[in-house]
């Protein structure tokens, strides 16, 4: 028994000592001061402040009561979304002398109490317009001494009560992207320290606050692909009939003249009807006395005139065009002189003659043979100064100008455009008081000529090897020239009013265009490009504000 008690003695003492020690610990802990708040190794912390150096990320193990955080010389470059959301009471945030290059859209989300934000001496060159989203209490913001070249529009909109802003020390590029800032500085109640432009040269060292808004030319235009018609075509002619907008396309590959209708709801061109035409080169719609006619010019099998019957809602053949007179049509032009309707056909055959037809009561009748044996390629009707003229281009001689004689009721040869020995297409336009001709050439440069009162003079040559089509057109106050080629992409030129010349504006990926057609469709301004080898493309003209 004594031995048994001897063996249990040490164990019982250990148990007693352990119990006593635990009680003492409880007593001591009851008298110990509050526990030091958690703090990452790279930081110095108090209950409500943290100062961090060389941190590898935004510290997470910080007191939740922290209201002031400083990050210096951080070893990371990106501040990610929600990086400070674990510090909802933060009022002061200083991110100075770091290597930050990117700040996420919602980096400061959840900091509804933040009043002071300093992001200085970093490598930030761009910010998102949503960078400061959620900072509804921010009063002081500094972005000084970064690499900011621009600022997105409305970046400061979420900062309702911002009173002080510092943007000094940034290499601001004072182009259209900064125009909004100039406007904002003129109307804001925020105090902003003077900031200066680093570029462009004309604004270098100019104070941003003093830049005149009129110096910013920020409105430009663009042609964007709007609709693709999955078939080749060689001509396109828009027309209005019964208050609806249509488009007639010559499709020799499909053996048809295809009629499309503009859908004002879907804002697209839709299939409407077809006229059989095995070798169509041009489908010319004409609305005469409220009746719709389509002149179908074909290389083979004769050319015809069709009439739209609204009762049967179909096209019916109205008459033939004399195949002995029109052998190989290449272009059609319709026009009106002194109340009479005419159409002219350019004949490109060696034995053909360009011919003029006139509407009389119930059909079109031959009126005049203009130009025989010259392989004509294109026609352009010009009605200026009360003197109707018809210009005929040819692959074998210089373009010929005909003027309408009211006494003879015929076109009379007036002269030649001697500056161009041959031309595939001829178009005209007016700019101010001046009249111009545009002539495309398959071999050699296309020409822009200006009428000088007694003759044409060349004002510009445009490289255009392989060109069979060109078209000047006006959209609002913007004048353009579309110049196609069989060997390269289509070039869009824009008229420079100051230089009185076309300057290269845009390139369109159109293969072997055979025509260009401008078609306003409601508020959509469309450019159609029928292609001989590929799809027919529809581009939309849009206005772009570079300051947006």
Curated annotation (Swiss-Prot):
Q: Where are the EAR repeats?
A: 222-264, 268-310, 314-361, 363-406, 410-453, 455-497, 501-543
Signal peptide residue numbers: 1-30
Q: Which GO terms describe its biological process?
A: exocytosis; regulation of exocytosis
Q: Which residues are glycosylated?
A: 189, 311
Pinpoint the LRRCT domain residues. Answer: 170-220
Q: Which PROSITE patterns match?
A: EAR, LRR
- What's in the keyword line of the UniProt record? Cell projection, Cytoplasmic vesicle, Exocytosis, Glycoprotein, Leucine-rich repeat, Repeat, Secreted, Signal, Synapse, Synaptosome
What's the protein here called?
Leucine-rich repeat LGI family member 3
Say which species the protein is native to. Mus musculus (Mouse)
Gene label: Lgi3
């Amino acid at each position: 028994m004594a031995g048994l008690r001897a063996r249990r003695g040490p164990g019982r003492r250990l148990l007693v000592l352990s119990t006593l020690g635990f009680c003492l610990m409880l007593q001591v802990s009851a008298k110990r001061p509050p526990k030091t708040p958690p703090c990452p190794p790279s930081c110095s912390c108090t209950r409500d402040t943290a100062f961090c150096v060389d941190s590898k990320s935004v510290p997470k193990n910080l007191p939740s009561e922290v209201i002031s955080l400083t990050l210096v010389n951080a070893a990371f470059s990106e501040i990610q979304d929600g990086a400070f959301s674990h510090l909802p009471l933060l009022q002061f945030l200083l991110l100075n002398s770091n290597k930050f290059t990117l700040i996420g859209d919602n980096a400061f989300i959840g900091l509804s109490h933040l009043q002071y934000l300093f992001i200085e001496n970093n490598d930030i060159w761009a910010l998102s317009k949503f960078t400061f989203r959620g900072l509804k209490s921010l009063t002081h913001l500094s972005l000084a001494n970064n690499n900011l070249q621009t600022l997105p529009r409305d970046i400061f909109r979420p900062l309702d009560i911002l009173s002080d802003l510092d943007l000094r020390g940034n290499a601001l590029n004072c182009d259209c992207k900064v125009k909004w800032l100039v406007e904002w500085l003129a109307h804001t109640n925020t105090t902003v320290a003077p900031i200066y432009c680093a570029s462009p040269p004309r604004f270098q060292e100019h104070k941003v606050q003093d830049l005149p808004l009129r110096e910013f030319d920020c409105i430009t235009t663009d042609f964007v692909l709007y609709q693709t018609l999955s078939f080749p075509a060689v001509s396109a002619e828009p027309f209005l009939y019964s208050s609806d907008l249509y488009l007639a396309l010559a499709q020799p590959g499909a053996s048809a003249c295809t009629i499309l209708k503009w859908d004002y709801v879907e804002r697209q061109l839709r299939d409407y009807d077809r006229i059989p035409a095995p070798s169509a080169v041009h489908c010319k719609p004409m609305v005469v006395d409220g009746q719709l006619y389509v002149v179908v010019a074909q290389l083979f099998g004769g050319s015809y005139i069709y009439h739209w019957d609204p009762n049967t809602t179909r096209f019916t053949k109205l008459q033939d065009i004399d195949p002995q007179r029109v052998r190989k049509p290449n272009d059609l032009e319709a026009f009106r002189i002194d109340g009479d309707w005419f159409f002219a056909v350019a004949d490109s055959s060696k034995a053909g003659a360009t011919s003029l037809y006139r509407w009389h009561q119930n059909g079109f009748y031959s009126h005049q043979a203009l130009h025989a044996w010259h392989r004509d390629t294109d026609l352009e009707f010009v009605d200026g100064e009360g003197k109707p003229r018809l210009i005929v281009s040819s692959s074998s001689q210089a373009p010929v100008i005909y003027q309408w004689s009211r006494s003879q009721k015929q076109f009379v040869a007036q002269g030649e455009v001697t500056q161009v020995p041959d031309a595939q297409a001829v178009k005209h336009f007016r700019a101010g008081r001046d009249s111009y001709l545009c002539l495309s050439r398959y071999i050699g440069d296309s020409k822009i000529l200006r009428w000088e009162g007694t003759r044409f003079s060349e004002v510009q040559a445009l490289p255009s090897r392989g060109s069979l089509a060109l078209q000047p057109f006006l959209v609002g106050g913007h004048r353009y020239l579309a110049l196609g080629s069989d060997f390269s992409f289509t070039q869009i030129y824009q008229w420079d009013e100051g230089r009185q010349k076309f300057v290269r504006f845009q390139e369109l990926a159109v293969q072997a265009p055979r025509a260009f057609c401008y078609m306003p469709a409601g508020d959509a301004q469309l450019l159609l490009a029928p292609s001989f080898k590929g799809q027919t493309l529809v581009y939309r003209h849009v206005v772009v504000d570079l300051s947006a």
